[in-house]
Amino acid sequence: GGTAVTTAYTYLDGAYGSNSTTPLVRTMTQAGTELTYTYDETGNITGISDGQQEITYVYDLLGQLIRVNDPYDTTAGTAGTTWVFAYDHGGNIQQKTAYAYTTGSVGAAVKCDTFAYTDANWKDKLTALNGVNITYDEIGNPLSDGTWQYKWAQGRQIRGMQKSGEEVAFAYNADGLRVQKTATSTGTTKYIMHGRNLVHLIRGDENLHFFYDAQNKPAIAIYNGTAYAYLYNQQDDVVGMVDSEGQLVVKYQYDAWGQPISTGGALAETRVR
């Protein structure tokens, strides 16, 4: 037995008020937390509130994300981070700048990443990050980025990565799906597939078995014999996991691009996501 994990949704009213609805989620409630979403007139998310803090998003007239005010992102300090983004005429990001969190005018930059696209024939190919050149093979696979060197096979199948003190190798099955990863720092990880779904993972003394829901998203992970359920946000990021009693055991935070920025909770170090 155990506690059922329930996610409840409400939606924005449609053109006829409470007699109609839209596909836009207004609130999403799970594991005791309610997230409230706001949108602009084109359906872009402009705010996500958990009842304590709100992450806000700003877009330009082309719908490009140009600013994020995130009180949970600690890049610029424990009080949060405001990110400002600049793009070229082709929509490629050119600059990503972090400031101390504010919803008003920003102060001095804390961090700035710059992106260059200098290939005359491939206008949106990233050729340098923060002044460090990125090289590619003839079909566009990266070969080096200033830190890692990459090896490829069968077109776009990555076979290995190497940097100072670390080497990673990958193996695949006949369908081209990854079945093994071996790294200097973490040893060997084996992946057991059912069709295209990962159903079992073995990593040292860690064993994980995965079950999927009707939308083919991971719903349950059995970690070393104990079951945990996945929690998702509206953007389909895994934001946490709960145990059989419905208690939150791990929580994940992401940036606006879906990249993880922090992990907390009792299972933070277990890599069950």
Regions found by a protein language model. Give the residues of each.
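Residue-level markers of secondary-structure register and packing in elongated scaffolds
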Residues: 1-10, 36-95, 133-193, 200, ...
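Short loop/turn segments immediately following beta-strands, especially the blade-tip
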Residues: 14-18, 118
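Extracellular beta-strand-rich, repetitive "passenger/adhesive" scaffolds
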Residues: 20-24
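Short polybasic amphipathic segments
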Residues: 25-27, 126-127, 196-202, 219-221
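A surface-exposed, glycine/aromatic-enriched loop/edge motif typical of exported proteins
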Residues: 86-115, 235
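Extracellular, surface-exposed repeat architectures
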Residues: 110-128
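Extended, non-globular alpha-helical segments
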Residues: 206-216
